[in-house]
Amino acid sequence: MIILRFLVLFILLCSLGNAQQRKMGLDSIDKNKVSLNYLFYLPESYQVDENIDWPLVLFLHGMGERGNDLELVKVHGIPKIVDTKRDFPFIAVSPQCPMDYVWRDQEMLEALESLLIKIIKNYRVDKSRIYVTGLSMGGRGTWAIVAHRPDLFAAAAPICGGGDPKTASKLITVPFWVFQGALDTVHYPKESEVMIQSLKKVGGEVRYTLYPELHHDSWTITYDNPDLYKWFLSNKNN
């Protein structure tokens, strides 16, 4: 039997100052032959009212954060935001891709699906408000996981990473907001724009933000923008 181990990092923000409480836990499910560690964040108010279900955002990091050191995952994106923002209004799940994989691999897509299902079963997740975002390799993974399970997601925000245009017809039920640096030479704007054009051709809903003066790092300005999170919350999966 192959065990897929999930290392859970519970982050509960303190009510005073900027201090944080962190609880470590270990869990496992039977799935693929990968070991998937992840950071897990519950909103400060999660324990206050047990009748409230919370939106969830899945964050997929880039190529440089792969491995088995969760500290790397905290460097960019959603984990960086929740480390500094006391009132982040989402359950946040930030897995770490093993070194020998990329998010688009079928094994990883199935592992991510299992992870989300597990979180949904064990926490008060609003199943109509599950979102996914990622940067670079994680941007590519964002397109891929939505194509893999479009029914799970209410909206998606890939940053500086394209997808497979042949999957466009699978994406039409999910609104996309795509972000890209115009001067990016790691993942050229064309990668994102091909996906946008393919999605529009099949009737998908997509908006595009192109930063004219940015190179590959188009994620810092994006994740610092409150409008991204407002847009997430404006979309529900019926």
Q: Each PLM stretch: what is its role?
A:
Residues 159, 175-238:
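C-terminal catalytic histidine-bearing segment of alpha/beta-hydrolase fold enzymes
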